[in-house]
Design a protein with these regions (language model features):
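Structural signature for extended repeat/solenoid scaffolds and their inter-repeat hinge/linker regions
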Residues: 169, 173, 178, 184-190, ...
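Assembly/oligomerization scaffold segments
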Residues: 1-112, 166, 296
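Short, well-ordered loop/turn sites that connect or cap secondary structure elements
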Residues: 52-53, 307-308, 452
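Extended, domain-scale alpha-helical bundle/helix-rich regions
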Residues: 84, 117-135, 141, 149-377
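Glycine-rich, acidic and aromatic/proline-enriched surface loops and short helix-turn segments
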Residues: 99-101, 116-137, 268-283, 402-431, ...
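Short alpha-helix capping/helix-loop boundary micro-motifs
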Residues: 38-48, 293-304, 441-447
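Short, solvent-exposed secondary-structure boundary/capping segments
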Residues: 79-98, 180-181, 336-351, 407-412, ...
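Short, Lys/Arg- and Gly-enriched loop/turn segments at beta-strand edges
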Residues: 66-74, 322-330, 339, 465-475
Length: 727
């Protein structure tokens, strides 16, 4: 077996001359979707300063077929593990842990919100925040914009890992021959366009453990194949408030022709993370199914070829049991140590930890690669193994919106908030997505509605603990928004008080005071009040139980009041209209007084107006002004069954005008008209006219006729005419 050089590079090499620093061993573990873990052992002549090494770039290089391979990264940990004291020097042993730059994302965590970005844009933003640009995208799929995506309480690496696992993106580090001194991160999502043949080794033969005359440098020495039971389909479902009655279920069945009879098993997941976007749901189900299919048939092998590289394809020939075919390396562990001729005896180091462990069959070898591969017919996907953060408990936030607004909502009564942990949001309408607001009662065009207003503090909880699905479940008082009632002085007061918008300064209120013996219910309308009762209303005041009164029919208002009723209109008019029906006032005991400073007009368009005084008097007094009764059509009848009917005009005139028809006055005893000492009296005995002067004038004729007529003048009697006839 040929001996090819292996070098340890980096800041350590610059600290010591080549003859004062030598590599004693290294292991490198890499796998799709994982961070490469590299452990290096080395010895120096004399101690080094650990602080000069940690955090610096380091790499192990080895020569392969056609060029060099470089495994490198950042020294994340270094440990002094032992020493060998000699007469004139000290050999010191060290173990360094080396990780690629992606590992640095495990050292950073954040709470932040991404909006209207796809998964690739989010990943690139996270990389860019740390200044990392050494990656290549070999992506074939199109990724939908995520309206709202939250990182909370998780490292940057965990955050992007769970997103990639969900979307079917995986990554590896390209450290193949001639790939460059710095391993580059490759982002993949497709078996056809993301992977190429292994440089310098597109075809490799299976030789077994070898034999005389067999060159093991370019062969597979171990090969095993395993098959596993996988489910036959993946079913996902989700819910979206915009389509609440629509099923969003998607199903993806395996494309693998399984040899077992258990393909009827199903993986069911709810909620999946696609809302009503079933196209995205189908892709997610496909990714989950492909992750299962990746594990259906896997191969494990070993080779001493230094060219075999993760993320690359090779063709296996002369394999056992018909295993010839094209394969993709999805994981590899590299064991490296100096060639026998380059090794020095450091077993005499006084060590505080054991040496790196190598496979037993590596004895006498300087390199071996143990790898895991799948057929290139299978689309690799990583399993969703990175946990999502679970948003347990409650969170608080403040309602936000555009500048100058007090209430900001959409047609569904949703709001936007600013979380106190969000360092990016600007406390405006762009801080979050629209967030649903829980209510004690909701229905189609009915329920309880109270939109949280800007600057109010709200309680946020999350659907199934999903950080991407917040819901407002309540509200909280704080120092800036104190309770509406005077606590703690009046702890018995409770109720609802609103705030006039915009600008405040007024409110509507429904207040209750439960103070014993002083209980109170107060209602305030800041401006207008509308009250609609579609059947009947019963109001009882001053009693312990409801009393419907005399009328309890549908469409009725019944008011029973034990004591007084006072209505005062300080300014304006009082209109009372009965479109149909009767009005009845009954005062069983007591009096009624109506006092009007101006006019009173009563108009009865059709029907009768009846005033009945059963016992007592009826008196109408107009101190100043007029009293006018008008009947447009019909009759006016005044009836006094027992008692008197008296009309008194203290100052002014009394006029009776019958334009058409007649005026008739009838009395049982007498009718008398008086002016001063003059009178006309009509009684049962006759008609008596008395006056200081009586004039009877007939324009054409005047006739006085009776059975007996007496004309008498105590002083003088004059009978005068053009012709006077006395018979």
């Amino acid at each position: 077996m040929s001996e090819l050089p292996i070098e340890l590079k980096g800041i350590i090499a610059s600290l010591k001359a080549p003859d004062e620093l030598w590599l004693t061993g290294a292991t490198i573990e890499e796998e799709f979707g994982e961070i490469t873990e590299m452990t290096v052992e080395f010895v120096t002549k004399g101690p080094i300063v650990l602080g000069d090494v940690v955090g610096q770039a380091m790499s192990v290089s080895m020569e392969g077929e056609g060029g060099f391979r470089h495994f490198g990264g950042i020294c994340t940990s270094i440990e002094r593990v032992g020493e060998k004291v000699m007469e004139d020097s000290v050999d010191v042993g060290y173990v360094a842990e080396i990780r690629p730059w992606l590992w640095m994302l495990t050292r950073a965590s954040n709470n932040r919100i991404f909006q209207d970005k796809d998964v690739v844009e989010i990943i690139e933003e996270v990389f860019g925040d740390h200044g990392f640009v050494d990656y290549t995208k070999k992506l074939n799929a199109s990724y939908e914009k995520r309206l709202y995506c939250v990182q909370f309480g998780e490292t940057d690496y965990a955050f992007i890992s769970r997103l990639m696992e969900e979307e079917g993106i995986y990554h590896f580090w390209n450290n193949a021959v001639n790939a460059g001194e710095l391993s580059k991160l490759i982002l993949c999502d497709n078996k056809s366009s993301s992977h190429v043949d292994t440089p310098g080794m597109s075809t490799i033969k299976f030789t077994g453990s070898g034999g005389a005359g067999i060159n093991l440098d370019h062969s597979v020495t171990d090969w095993t194949s395993a098959e596993n039971v996988i489910p036959g389909k993946v079913t996902l479902n989700d819910y979206d408030m915009l389509t609440p009655t629509v099923s969003h279920q998607v199903v993806t069945e395996t494309v693998v022709d399984t040899a077992h009879s258990h393909a009827t098993y199903e993986l069911y997941q709810y909620p999946a993370n696609y809302r009503k976007d079933t196209a995205r749901g189908n892709r997610m189900a496909e990714v989950l199914m492909e992750a299962q299919e990746t594990e259906y048939k896997v191969r494990h092998g070993a080779t001493t070829s230094r060219n075999l590289a993760i993320g690359h394809k090779f063709t296996l020939e002369e394999a056992p049991e018909g295993e010839d075919g094209d394969y993709l390396v999805i994981a590899a562990t590299h064991y490296i140590r100096p060639s026998i001729s380059q090794r020095q005896d450091h077993n005499q180091l006084i060590r505080d930890r054991r040496n790196l462990q190598y496979p037993e069959e590596m004895e006498g070898m300087d390199y071996q690669c143990r790898f895991k591969a799948i057929s290139t017919d299978i689309q690799y996907r990583s399993k969703c193994k990175t946990p999502w953060p679970s948003m347990t408990g409650i969170h608080s936030a403040h309602v936000v919106g555009p500048s100058g607004e007090e209430i900001y909502t959409d047609e569904h009564g949703r709001i936007k908030v600013q979380f106190p942990w969000d360092r990016v949001g600007q406390n405006d309408e762009n801080s979050t997505c629209w967030i649903r607001v829980a209510t004690p009662w909701s229905g189609k065009d009915w329920g309880m509605v109270a939109i949280p207003r800007i600057d109010q503090e709200v309680i946020i909880q999350f659907e199934n603990g999903n950080p991407d699905r917040p819901v407002v479940t309540g509200m909280l008082w704080n120092e800036d928004t104190k309770p509406a009632f005077p606590y703690p002085d009046k702890p018995t007061e409770l109720g609802i008080r609103t705030n006039s918008s915009k600008g405040g300064g007024g409110y509507n209120e429904l207040m209750f005071d439960d103070l014993k013996d002083e209980e109170l219910m107060r209602v305030q309308a800041q401006k207008d009040h509308q009250f609609l009762i579609k059947n009947k209303s019963v109001v009882t005041i001053g009693l312990d139980e409801i009393d419907a009164g005399a009328h309890d029919e549908d469409g009725s208002l019944s008011e029973v009041i034990r004591n007084h009723v006072t209505r005062t209109i300080k300014e304006g008019d009082h209109y009372f209209t009965m479109e149909e029906g009767n009005e009845e006032y009954t005062i069983d005991q007591g009096t009624q007084t109506i006092e009007i400073e101006g006019d009173k007009t009563e108009t009865i368009r059709t029907g009768n107006h009846v005033h009945t005084v059963q016992t007592g008097n009826m008196e109408t007094t107009v101190e100043t002004g007029n009293h006018e009764t008008t009947v447009d059509t019909g009759n006016m009848t005044t009836t006094v069954s027992t008692g008197n009917h008296e009309t008194t005009v203290s100052t002014g005139n009394h006029t009776l005008d019958v334009s058409l028809g007649k005026s008739e006055t009838e009395a049982m005893q007498s009718i008398e008209f008086k002016v001063g000492s003059n009178s006309i009296k009509i009684d049962q005995m006759g008609v008596t006219i008395k006056g200081m002067m009586i004039k009877i004038e007939g324009t054409m004729t005047a006739e006085m006729k009776s059975m007996m007529t007496t004309v008498k003048g105590d002083a003088m009697t004059t009978v005068k005419g053009g012709i006077t006839m006395i018979n």
